[in-house]
């Protein structure tokens, strides 16, 4: 392998919007995620829907247009 072309790989702190934090390996120091294993419906057993909303949904909501 060539030297000095690979990014530095080290510990990274991952924080979720639910408040959960944990450490993993990454080329970045800090990662922020919307869903983790503590709040994902598959792992929790709940069937709640999480709306993240994209540009199209915000446009439809703003102008009162149907899907």
From Swiss-Prot:
Names of required cofactors: Zn(2+)
Key words, A-Z: Metal-binding, Ribonucleoprotein, Ribosomal protein, RNA-binding, rRNA-binding, Zinc
Cofactor note: Binds 1 zinc ion per subunit.
InterPro entries registered for this protein in UniProt: Ribosomal_bL28/bL31-like_sf, Ribosomal_bL31, Ribosomal_bL31_A, Ribosomal_bL31_sf
Keyword Transcription recorded: no
GO molecular function: metal ion binding; rRNA binding; structural constituent of ribosome
GO cellular component, one term: ribonucleoprotein complex
Binding site for Zn(2+): 16, 18, 36, 39
GO biological process: translation
Reported function: Binds the 23S rRNA.
Subunit (UniProt): Part of the 50S ribosomal subunit.
Membership in a protein family: Belongs to the bacterial ribosomal protein bL31 family. Type A subfamily.
Stated name of the protein: Large ribosomal subunit protein bL31
Gene: rpmE
